[in-house]
Amino acid sequence: MITIVSTENDALSAQLAAAINNKTKPLGSLGMLETLARQIGLIQQTTQAQIIDPALIVFAADHGIVAENVSAYPQSVTWQMVENFLAGGAAINVFARQNHCALHIVDAGVNHDFGRREGLLDRKVAYGTRNFAQETAMSAEQCAQAVQAGMDLAAGIKGNVLGFGEMGIGNTTAAAAIMQAMTKLPAAECVGAGTGLAHEGILHKQKVVQDAVAYHAAIVAKNAPLDILATFGGFEIAMIVGAMLKAAERRMVLLIDGFIITSALMIAARLQPSILDYCVFAHCSDEHGHRQMISHLGGRPVLQMGLRLGEGTGSVLALPLLHAAVNFLREMATFESADVSQQNA
């Protein structure tokens, strides 16, 4: 298993603080940009941090839990949206082009035969997971295969920033079950509308999650993150866990998107707590439970925009702020270089 080292470095942290504080501005006046500059500097081990060739991987897979009527959309939307990604017509395509972010699309386990397709990375573990209301979503072997596939994909990314996106009808239910199993919070605090369920649908979804977590109580009680992942997760979530671990091992900046991506991070952080040093929480989703997830992980979201689309859209929308953070650190004048007087003692 991968070992992720903490970015903590007292000497470099002091150098970064001095560099930031000596820019031509009042102390702390760039707010969260200063926090990001320090974090990225510690990740990259330099006071001259930069963003190089950012990339985002969208992982798609289907979920057996849809048999419990937990989504407002049919399962076929998963493969139809993959086709939309490949055609360049989804929101993530638009935002990735706008922000010069390389986009990779992965079939992690969609219930559809795509054949050989340009632009689609075939890592299909199976044609969707099993129904975790009745049995574990995947076998331990399938879970390990998916995690390893994610690691291998992240190993091949060229840049130093990696974001994660997902597509899978039913995956907010899987993420909510992971959240409840990991935090022991009531299902009502973990379950939201997903793709747009009405109030009665949300109540039904809460019961499905509550009952499923209770059904697998013996597994949940062990608090073993990979067992929880195999029991409730999707193949896309498992691949994201692996990709996160490998990206952090490579000292990349990890852009964390919404509810499903953060559920994967909960698993990864239980395996390797230092991974959180590498994570930028791009936004706080409107999906119920995401704020609690972020708080549980000690994170602070960059954006608050009411997003709940997924696909990695929030991560790519936060990219300009990462550029701004490293650019002011490298390019902004100091009081000395600009011959500007500092504040009175």
UniProtKB/Swiss-Prot annotation:
- Pfam families from the entry? DBI_PRT
According to its UniProt record, the EC number is: 2.4.2.21
Catalytic residue list: E311
Keyword Transferase present in the record's keywords: the answer is: yes
Gene Ontology molecular function: nicotinate-nucleotide-dimethylbenzimidazole phosphoribosyltransferase activity
Q: Which family does it belong to?
A: Belongs to the CobT family.
What does this protein do, in the record's words? Answer: Catalyzes the synthesis of alpha-ribazole-5'-phosphate from nicotinate mononucleotide (NAMN) and 5,6-dimethylbenzimidazole (DMB).
Q: Which named protein is this? A: Nicotinate-nucleotide--dimethylbenzimidazole phosphoribosyltransferase
What is the name of the gene encoding this protein? cobT
